Swiss-Prot record:
<keyword id="KW-0067">ATP-binding</keyword>
<protein>
    <recommendedName>
        <fullName>5-oxoprolinase subunit A</fullName>
        <ecNumber>3.5.2.9</ecNumber>
    </recommendedName>
</protein>
<dbReference type="GO" id="GO:0005524">
    <property type="term" value="F:ATP binding"/>
</dbReference>
<comment type="similarity">
    <text>Belongs to the LamB/PxpA family.</text>
</comment>
<dbReference type="InterPro" id="IPR005501">
    <property type="entry name" value="LamB/YcsF/PxpA-like"/>
</dbReference>
<comment type="function">
    <text>Catalyzes the cleavage of 5-oxoproline to form L-glutamate coupled to the hydrolysis of ATP to ADP and inorganic phosphate.</text>
</comment>
<comment type="subunit">
    <text>Forms a complex composed of PxpA, PxpB and PxpC.</text>
</comment>
<dbReference type="Pfam" id="PF03746">
    <property type="entry name" value="LamB_YcsF"/>
</dbReference>
<dbReference type="GO" id="GO:0017168">
    <property type="term" value="F:5-oxoprolinase (ATP-hydrolyzing) activity"/>
</dbReference>
<keyword id="KW-0547">Nucleotide-binding</keyword>
<dbReference type="GO" id="GO:0005975">
    <property type="term" value="P:carbohydrate metabolic process"/>
</dbReference>
<dbReference type="InterPro" id="IPR011330">
    <property type="entry name" value="Glyco_hydro/deAcase_b/a-brl"/>
</dbReference>
<keyword id="KW-0378">Hydrolase</keyword>
Length: 251
């Protein structure tokens, strides 16, 4: 089988358990994705979970990405913290360095960085935060995954100052605004629930590089990868359908 013309990959946040607390269904999801965004201990995860998730990714030949977030276990990294640019850079280096060390222990490496939660959102809203994260990615010489939007060129120009490649991601199950940004989760319908709507969004992205917005308009969205979520049996089945759709071109 061959991927469609844009060769979109699937990425998923993983390794977000902590001690005896379990989150997600990584064992079931990993065989169906191309890239695993592994939590690095600040918003979720711990050294043992990180190790086990790396092992699982290696088993299924899945690219490993570092998924750093704000130091906020209780809030799952979804609350913004006021930090200086240097603090953000060092915070990201600290987390990515931990995951990279655990990767090296298994003779592998991280392939990219994708910030989590509020850090991801802040990075897309603030050029200063974006630069702080890019500086960390430059140290590890890996691409940075960010939200595909109408401002891709702006972010490419900033990242180019540090020789950091960018990976642009779209979301299978999120409602978009006309400016290409995600509808905030506090709004109703921000997360798509209907399976057919999610599959249609993925197919439209893959076939034409467009996405339907909350206003009913279509906008261009240049993406390299699609983020999926695998929290339960229903979502795992949906990931399988999304992957099949990408490989079959929707047939």
């Amino acid at each position: 089988m061959t991927l469609n013309k844009q060769q979109l990959t699937l990425n998923c946040d993983m390794g977000e358990s902590f001690g005896s607390w379990k989150m997600g269904a990584d064992d079931s999801v990993m065989p169906h994705v191309d890239m695993a965004n592994i939590a690095c201990g600040f918003h979720a995860s711990d050294p043992n979970v990180m190790h086990d998730t790396i092992t699982l990714a290696n088993l299924h030949d899945v690219d490993i990405g570092a998924h750093p977030g704000y130091p906020d276990l209780q809030g799952f990294g979804r609350r913004s913290l006021s930090m200086s640019s240097d603090e953000i850079t060092n915070m990201v280096i600290y987390q990515v360095g931990a995951l990279q060390a655990l990767c090296r222990a298994q003779y592998t490496d991280i392939g990219y960085i994708k910030p989590h939660g509020a850090l991801y959102n802040d990075m897309m809203k603030s050029d200063a935060v974006f630069r702080a994260v890019v500086k960390a990615a430059a140290l590890f010489k890996v691409p940075l995954m960010i939200l595909a939007s109408q401002e891709n060129e702006k972010y490419l120009e900033i990242a180019d100052d540090y020789d950091v490649p960018l990976l642009f991601e779209a979301f299978a199950d999120r409602l978009y605004q006309d400016d290409g940004m995600l509808t905030p989760r506090r709004h109703p319908n921000a997360v798509l629930k209907d399976e057919l709507a999610i599959l249609e969004q993925v197919r439209t992205l893959a076939d034409s590089g467009r996405v339907k917005t909350a206003s009913g308009s279509y906008i261009l969205l240049e993406a390299d990868t699609i983020c999926v979520h695998g929290d339960n049996e229903e979502s795992i089945a949906l990931i399988q359908k999304i992957r099949q759709s990408l490989y079959s071109g929707g047939n």
